[in-house]
Amino acid sequence: MAAAALGFGFQAMRAPAVPADTIVAGFQKTTVASVADAMDQVVGRRGFMSHDMRPRTAGPGVPAKFAGRAVTALMRQATPEQASPTLSAKHSVEMIDNSKPGEVGVLSIENGLDVAGLGGLMGTAARARGMAGVIIDGGVRDVGEVRALGLAVFARSVVPSSSVGRYATVDRNVPVQCAGVEVRPGDIIVAGEDGVVAVPSDRAQEVLKRANEIDQRESKMVPLIQQLKALGKAVQQFNRI
């Protein structure tokens, strides 16, 4: 149920202070594209989610880019016994209610593009907990309310439908597939206008180092390209495109 349907107003909320995490802080300063390239080069596999994983609550007061450690929940088509609101969202509610400030919720809904995994009420809770953002392999609804809260949500679709009676969560804090990428609890999620990248926690330091190197290389290329009014020599000199 949308919060507005109950007659309550809503407003942007101030998130609690986030404990220091030097790895996360480093990824907050890198570009999403450089993190994607660093995953290719360091880990040797794709880290970026599918092209339709887009920011759905972008606007004033909503972070355009964020990074944080993943907490996860998995949702599948419901059985008749799972049709109640309590059971339908049990694990995603627990994911939010047990989250720490700065963490990123990752909700995987199997074949769930026409199902909203988060709306105004869950968004209110996520923002109150100080979550950095939420990533949904599926849909989101109540986008105006969630935007007004200041919560960044990336999802593959925007739909008005409830998950109740259709889908139910089956587990949380387990590895999930999210828009073509495996995400494990504690992995680093980096999200921005270019999309979303998941970085394995055990390779995060290496990936961050390479992403910083890529950013630094490109920052040197830009003035050279402007000076030469050409691209080829800069690409040859820096081996980067």
Task: Give the positions of each predicted feature.
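N-terminal export leaders
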Residues: 1-5
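Extracellular/luminal Protease-associated
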Residues: 95-137
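Ligand/cofactor pocket segment of small-molecule handling proteins
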Residues: 128, 132-160
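Acidic, glycine-rich flexible loop/linker segments
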Residues: 156-234
